[in-house]
Amino acid sequence: MKKILLIFIGFLIMSCDDYLDIVPDKTQELSLLFERKEAAYTALVTCYSYMPQNDGIYSTYVLASDELTTPFAKDTPAIELMKGEQNADNPIMGYWSGYSALGRGQESLFKGIRACNTLIQNIDNVLDMTPEEKLNWKSEAIFLKAYYHFLLLIHYGPIPIVDVNLPISSSVDDVKVRRELVDDVFQYIFNTVDLSIDGLIERNLTTNSFGRIDKVIAKSFKSRVSIYYASPMFNGNTEIFSSFTNENGEHYFNQIYDETKWNLAAEYTSEAIQACLDNGLSLYEYNGQPAAYDYTSYSNSNFIQKLYDLRYLIRDKWNSELIWGNSKPVGSNDEWWNLQAGALMKDPSASRVEAAWQWVAPTMRMAELYYTKNGLPIDEDIQFNFNNRYSTTYVGSNQMEEAQRGQQTAILNLNREPRFYSNIGFDRGFYRGWGELWRLRMKKGESHGRIANSSDYLTTGYSLKKIVHPDSEGDSYGKLVDYPWPLIRLAELYLSYAEALNEISGPSQEVFDAINKVRARAGIPMIDEIWSNPSFAKTPGKHTSRDGLREIIHQERMIELAFEGHRYYDLRRWLKAHEYFNTPVFGWSVDESERDSYYQKILVGQRTFLKERDYLHPIKTTELTRNSNLIQNPNW
């Protein structure tokens, strides 16, 4: 049996060069590899193993947008991507052919699809499984096949549809696949997810099943697919892809905007939300004990309670809001691969800081993105001192939960919403980490600032709290607290529902209600309340027009889902990426030790994103050589 398993695993995990050769291995009796449940389970695990790891510092697309930056010496593949170093000869972070970085990377997702097809086509041969087990495992593989097609679609646009592994007798022409029209790929994904749903269990909540696909996950994923399907990049995209056609002259991207796609998105998202509610999911609220340093303030302060809700939101394992999480995170033992270690600040009093690198930093753009305490953008709040936001001021007694009373910090860092303080650290602010409450001192030479010319430093002067577990300690990798990376959570569905409804018929109470659920948990005023108040809003009534509300919804989404891997994809599907990703990166002057010199907005990096090229990733040149039926993406 052991020999069979080894052969089987070797069959599934082929070299990258063979990934889209969808002819099975030379082993004629493939069905023999599926005689026992043990082998079938190995096949299922292999199907899951191709899921990208967004908590890996060299594999995450979180770093590919304008959310985060690193010192030059710490460039990751995603940072290289956004600096304009992408190429077709050896694509950076390529899901089509796979890639490697520091000995790790991502295997081709076409290999993952092939692994799924292998299980789907053979699991019925297993002798020691019940029909119900076979159907459930097969349905999981069917879903994962749809998921991998979707990931390829949103990176490359038109892709080949690989629904089955071809027989060994297939001709050379049969295996030279072609790219399909984008709408056809979407329909295939919808149909494949639907095919999976009937055979899935309602909800996987047993300890050894966390992260495995169930009906709630499938319906929620279908919501996400439908939102992309309706969005400008994929719906009537004449702006960028008007000349991108196949050999028959057919446009790969449809050229006529179809508003009914938003109806589909609203329908699928409503169904997903109801499935979540029927299965007991809800927006997360912290129900544990506060840390000793917060014990008194927690019981007396709604602000501190909100910080706990938001700080543990994605870190409290398998909580009530998490619909789907990656059950195989990078982990504390993966050392140079761990994104949490890259963001974790160093303890200046620790004798070792092995797993606290302190060089993954939020950009100033992200610091400016979050709302004021009134729930308005900083440039829309009459009561916020927007024009002088880069100047410093003393922290008053009414701001002592936001920053250190009596200290001076930037006006930008004060009077902001709880999500800002939960997600981002700053000079003279607070940091809950290493099991302690730190009072941050971030100027050069200070306890949390850059030390001499070390390459471990926060280039913008901001630290990333959101992905760091408060109990993680950086003196060893074993002390990092692992958690499942959130792939889908309930807040996303509420915001997707609001987005779809607004695109269909404009503002309504139903749209406001969906957004307000997320805002209430964030501790900020309701959208229809604050945007109607001329004492606060510079543009009162902005929420009453479709265009105005669209802008509000987009910002709400970018705040709520910040640093989770959505921004790179959302800005592309909205066709806004070329506006955001082709701009400089700014931060504070972190090499300065004096206050007035430190609080200067300076250039810390440059991004490059070409509108006519970078919305799609390149197919590796060697793939085009091997398969003459493949057409390269525009301008690559």
Cite the ranges covered by each PLM segment.
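Short coil/turn linking the two alpha-helices of tandem helical-hairpin repeats
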Residues: 153-154, 158-160, 225-237, 503-506
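Conserved, well-structured interaction surfaces
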Residues: 38-55, 59, 77-156, 172-215, ...
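Long, intrinsically disordered, low-complexity segments
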Residues: 109, 188-190, 227, 253-255, ...
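Short coil/linker segments at helix-helix boundaries
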Residues: 159-179, 233-264
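Flexible, polar/acidic helix-loop-strand segments at domain edges
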Residues: 92, 332, 341, 350-489
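Membrane-proximal, proline-rich intrinsically disordered regions
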Residues: 16-64, 411-414, 620-636
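Bacterial Sec-dependent N-terminal signal peptides
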Residues: 1-25
